[in-house]
Amino acid sequence: MTQPSKTTKLTKDEVDRLISDYQTKQDEQAQETLVRVYTNLVDMLAKKYSKGKSFHEDLRQVGMIGLLGAIKRYDPVVGKSFEAFAIPTIIGEIKRFLRDKTWSVHVPRRIKELGPRIKMAVDQLTTETQRSPKVEEIAEFLDVSEEEVLETMEMGKSYQALSVDHSIEADSDGSTVTILDIVGSQEDGYERVNQQLMLQSVLHVLSDREKQIIDLTYIQNKSQKETGDILGISQMHVSRLQRKAVKKLREALIEDPSMELM
């Protein structure tokens, strides 16, 4: 069989067949063919994020890791094309590299030193209280300001914009849902906090009105009726928007490979 060049355009069926061959038979030739075809895609994304800087080759290498991961995890049953799945996977690896690079180069020493202390505090407080600690509890435990805790956690991509154990009304029948219900909970301690709090990174999928609903009912702990009164809409409308927002957040977390919540 003639090997396609990296500029060859494969049909969706051909891509799906090659991926199936690799996933089910560990066919390395199929993997090599896919890598050859999609190398240009990785190069293009690496160039976009390197912007001519010296670390372009580093981004290209981590982008290839993302491509290999996409080949390994892609499921055609989901319905989206391989390209639609691979692009955010590759970008996720690139952004993770840039995040780690920024952390190591630009983060002040005091923030780097506080990070391990926060991890220790979260582990101990979680054990003592059997729940994820709040920012103010971590600050009090470490005898530092809440601002320092937030700054450290934010720079480490693990700050708590939403209290993950805090419940909100899911419907007018009084049932409730927490963010942990949205993303699931398998981890304890710092890793659990670190992963669940990355929910903040997908809030952009919500409309302005949906963000208002989440802010009022979740962060400000207002009832659906109070929220409706503030926004000038019915409680039923609030309930519908809230369910829609929760669904969007759940789907965004599932689809975004950089979240690492699965």
From Swiss-Prot:
It comes from the Bacteria. The keyword Iron-sulfur does not apply. Induction: By heat shock, salt stress, oxidative stress, glucose limitation, oxygen limitation and entry into stationary phase. Association with RNAP core increases during alcohol, NaOH, NaCl stress and during sporulation (at protein level). CDD domains: Sigma70_r4. InterPro entries: RNA_pol_sigma-70_dom, RNA_pol_sigma-B, RNA_pol_sigma-B/F/G, RNA_pol_sigma70, RNA_pol_sigma70_r2, RNA_pol_sigma70_r3, RNA_pol_sigma70_r4, RNA_pol_sigma_r2. NCBIfam families: SigBFG, sigma70-ECF, Sigma_B. Interacts transiently with the RNAP core. Belongs to the sigma-70 factor family. SigB subfamily. This is RNA polymerase sigma-B factor. The lineage of its organism: Bacteria, Bacillati, Bacillota, Bacilli, Bacillales.
